[in-house]
């Protein structure tokens, strides 16, 4: 709760002005898939509501989001509904686990994100409605980079709220490649000379992908719809006033960061609930070695038989008991 209170203070500082009241009108642009991200934003919306702020979610038509007094829904005609988004995501996860090149799947996901962004920006009715709402702050999930575009079009301040993904090189954070492993490099902070060369190669490939494949998709969307004033997507990514990463330094390798990058892991923690009696007895019986909880989150619902069998075999070798959610 201390972390959540600090987060609310930071958001309040962003939206405060001498001529405005403390209550702010916030719009959140969650990704078109990954329901776990939406769960985090709902928790944030509840906390904002309790402090007197008003939160809106920009959600596609057909996406199942239960109503709540803590937030409002702004609907738009997107390319996915809840069922098709989940089917698409699980197919990507299955392909990755089957050995298909990860970056091919990521590019396909990116292509669907940009298609959806094109539909939103191109909807006169949706954009007019959002402009008339006069929001004070827009929260961007960096998985859904359209949030940067929408913040620019609406002319509102924006901050990034991420489950861990960010773009340190694009934001301006130093990345000494000798000890800062690149995302998806499968390296640690202790690298041999060959591994450092590999890390540098991964860094260059990813910078190429971001600057010449990912960001230009959104530049073309803004050019297509005549967005004024003109702005480069790279400048919009770098222009965020605050990056909030829902992870913890304990889970990261040491690396340089920036003053406006804040680690806020743990904001979803809450007092424990009592265990069912039979399960509590099972836990108490593990006093010697303890137990391990295995969970892949909401993004991974199905594992292939081969991978599940290998994981089960590895877990069976542990002295601890295992709870597989």
For each feature predicted by the language model, list its residue ranges:
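Glycosyltransferase specificity loop/lid
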Residues: 2-226, 235, 251, 260-273, ...
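Short, solvent-exposed loop/turn positions at domain surfaces
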Residues: 230-231
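Long, low-complexity segments enriched in small/aliphatic residues
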Residues: 236-253
């Amino acid at each position: 709760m201390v972390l959540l209170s600090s987060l609310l203070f930071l958001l309040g500082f962003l939206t405060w002005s001498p001529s405005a009241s403390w209550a702010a009108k916030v719009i959140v642009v969650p990704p078109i898939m990954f329901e776990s991200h939406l769960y985090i934003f709902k928790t944030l919306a509840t906390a904002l509501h309790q402090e007197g702020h008003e939160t809106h979610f920009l959600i596609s038509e057909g996406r199942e989001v239960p109503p709540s007094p803590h937030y409002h829904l702004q609907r738009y005609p997107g390319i996915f509904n809840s069922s098709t988004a989940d089917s698409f995501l699980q197919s990507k996860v299955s392909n990755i686990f089957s050995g298909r090149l990860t970056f091919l799947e990521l590019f396909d996901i990116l292509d669907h994100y940009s298609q959806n962004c094109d539909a939103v920006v191109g909807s006169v009715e949706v954009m007019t409605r959002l402009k008339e709402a006069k929001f004070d702050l827009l929260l961007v999930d960096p998985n859904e980079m359209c949030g940067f575009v929408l913040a620019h079009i609406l002319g509102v301040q924006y901050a990034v709220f991420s489950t861990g993904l960010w773009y340190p090189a694009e934001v301006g954070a130093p990345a000494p490649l000798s000890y800062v492993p690149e995302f998806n490099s499968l390296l640690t902070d202790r690298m041999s000379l060959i591994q450092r060369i590999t890390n540098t190669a991964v860094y260059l490939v990813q910078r190429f992908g971001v600057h010449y494949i990912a960001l230009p998709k959104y530049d073309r969307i803004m050019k297509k719809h005549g967005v004024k004033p003109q702005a480069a997507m790279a400048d919009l990514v770098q222009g965020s006033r605050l990056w909030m990463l829902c992870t913890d330094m304990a889970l990261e390798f040491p690396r340089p960061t920036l003053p406006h990058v804040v680690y806020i892991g743990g904001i979803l923690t809450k007092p424990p609930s009592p265990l069912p009696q039979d399960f509590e007895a099972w836990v108490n019986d593990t006093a010697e070695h303890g137990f391990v909880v295995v969970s892949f989150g909401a993004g991974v619902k199905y594992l292939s038989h081969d991978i599940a069998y290998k994981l089960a075999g590895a877990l069976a070798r542990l002295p601890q008991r295992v709870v597989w959610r």
